[in-house]
Structures are given as C-alpha cells and as structure tokens.
C-alpha cells in the first residue's frame, strides 16, 4: 500500500510545504506556529511536506483553516508600521529629479503633492499582501534588509496602481469623497488636470521597479505582471462603462454573467492576484501551474470582495467606509441591482426602471426601499457565509504547494469587513 494511502487510512492528511521549507518550519518552529498549531506533525526532509493529523474526515481542514486564519489575522497589523514608514523613502526617491533637473522643480512638487494626497489614507491591504505573502514564501535567512525593502517597494507599486485607478475612476463616476476626504479632482485648482496626475501615479510604478528590482531575476516578470494587471483592469472598466452608459438606463444589460465579467477584470486581477503573484515571483515561484492554482482562489476572493463593496456602497456607513456611494445614481451594474432583477415582480421591475440611474435623492431612496423590500441585506449576509465557505474549500484544494497561510490572512482580512 502506498505510504500516502496508509496515512489517510489512519487519519493523517498531507499538505505540501513551500519549496524552500526548512525542517524546523515543518516541525512547528516558533516563528510559524500557526501552520501546525494544535495538531501532531509528521515530517521528513526528503519528502518536502508537512502533515496534520485528524481523527475526522479531510473536511476538518476547513475548520482548521478558519482557526489558523484567526490566529494570523493580525499579521497585516504587524507589518503595517514598517510598510507605511517606507512611503517617505518612496516619495524621496521619486522626487530626487528636482536636484539634478531644477527646470522641472514645479512639476516634481506637483508629483509630491499627488503622491501624498492619493497614495495614502487607505487600508493598504493590497500593498501589505505583497509583504505578508513574501514573508511566507521566502526563506527566512533570505529576508535581509535589501530584500524587505524591495518587498515594501513592490507593495507600494500595487498601492500606486490602486491610486491611479481611483483618481481616474472618481472622475468618470463623478464621485464626491474618497478615503474620508474630497476626491482629488474635486479639489480647487485640480479639476480635469487630475487625468494627468493619474498618469503620473502609473508612471511612478515602473520607475520604482527599475530603481529597486532591475538587477533581480524576477524583474521582467514583475514588469509583465503590472502591465497585464493594468490592461485587465482597464478592460474591466471598459466593460463597466459600456454596460451602463450615462443617460441610457437599460436594465436588460445587467445580467449575472456580465456582472461577473466586470468584477473579474475590473477588481479581482489587480486587487487579489497581482499582490500574491508579485510575491510568488519574488520568491522564485514562476511555474504556470502554481500561478494558475493561486488564481483560482484569488479571483474568487476578488468577486467576494467586489460584492461586499457593492453592498457597502448603499448599506455601508459613509463615516466608516470613507466614501459616499453613487452606484444607483451612476446606473452601475452592481450586485444589488442584479439580485433585484432576479427577484422583482413586474410591478417592482417597473419601479426599478423608473428610478434607477437617476440623480434625484427621492428616486435613489425609492430604489433602496425596493432593495429592502426584497430583503437584499439578508440575501447578502447569506451570500457572504456561503462564499466564504467556498473560498475555504478552494484553499484546501488549490493552495498546495504554497502554505495555506498565504491565502488565509487575506481571506480573513476581507471576511465580514465593513469598509
């Protein structure tokens, strides 16, 4: 009988370790106790695996993953201080041109203002995910000061990409506030000059990658990853705009299939796959299978995240979310309107048709009342539970050979979020 089958017969289930995993990590090193906490471990160096024993079926892994996710949920908080402190170095490096080229001094001053207004003030989840995943995937002895600086910098590149998208998106959506302050384009003296400012934010990504990573073997992979993520997100934004053109409310366009396509391209690739994939490349993990498996988990997380965002746009507290939602006024193909269309009676459909995509406050309120009449908040809460369980199952199935903690920290970070 093969060893793996015998182990399963006695209630021991195997998960592959990361490629670099040292013996002490498989055995539950104090540096990574959560991977094996509470369970007996069987490991041997040549097998490249760590094991957890249960007396129950493999389904127990799902509850174990929830527990380990809880234990790791503060890892983002642990990394946040160093990550945020690195921003001053990012700004300094990006504005050094002023000293060598005084003729562009006022443009560099504008760049500094753009960076400091638009790149900070968020939750930093995307950037921190790069750092957290890097620490999980890279051998501890290789996490020296230089490599950590590169990880922080790549994390900030993800945050700059996010800032670039948000500045442009706020203009297109006529948004009022972002991260608890007025949108950049709404500031006196900015206006549509914000379009160029958004382009500056994007250009900074590639300057930083060149300055910090050009001597690294993964440099080209990172360049291609950021370019591909930008393209995918902009395709998603195009789908979003085409589905809901201004002044033309067509509810027939708002199908679940269309919604999933928008979410996949506009949100999931850059918000979830990009940061984990960047850390994987930095750890030397560039195999197609490993990236494909990670993508299966992360794109599902991205859909989960965007549906939360759509719900919070209307039912969230602006003092908590930091923004005033405008999806109804902007005629957006959101999860709420898709769910409404699936449940509405002919009379309710007519109410939606007459009020959706309109700016008047009373019409917005009528749509919200319709959503509440259809009990969509309860539908969302049930979706949130079901989707989280599905994500846990995907982690169980596809995480290997990466440690599940790479995905669990991110999943726990967004589960039950309210901003």
UniProtKB/Swiss-Prot annotation:
It catalyses: isopentenyl diphosphate + dimethylallyl diphosphate = (2E)-geranyl diphosphate + diphosphate; isopentenyl diphosphate + (2E)-geranyl diphosphate = (2E,6E)-farnesyl diphosphate + diphosphate. Belongs to the FPP/GGPP synthase family. GO terms for biological process: cholesterol biosynthetic process; farnesyl diphosphate biosynthetic process; geranyl diphosphate biosynthetic process. The keyword Lipid metabolism applies. The modification N6-(2-hydroxyisobutyryl)lysine is found at residue 123. This is Farnesyl pyrophosphate synthase. Mg(2+) 2 binds at residues 169, 173. Binds 2 Mg(2+) ions per subunit. Inactivated by interferon-induced RSAD2. This inactivation may result of disruption of lipid rafts at the plasma membrane, and thus have an antiviral effect since many enveloped viruses need lipid rafts to bud efficiently out of the cell. Dimethylallyl diphosphate binds at residues 178, 266-267, 306, 323, 332. It is an enzyme of class 2 (transferase). It comes from Homo sapiens. Keywords: Acetylation, Cholesterol biosynthesis, Cholesterol metabolism, Cytoplasm, Disease variant, Host-virus interaction, Hydroxylation, Isoprene biosynthesis, Lipid biosynthesis, Lipid metabolism, Magnesium, Metal-binding, Steroid biosynthesis, Steroid metabolism, Sterol biosynthesis, Sterol metabolism, Transferase. Its main location: cytoplasm. One of its GO terms (cellular component) is mitochondrial matrix.
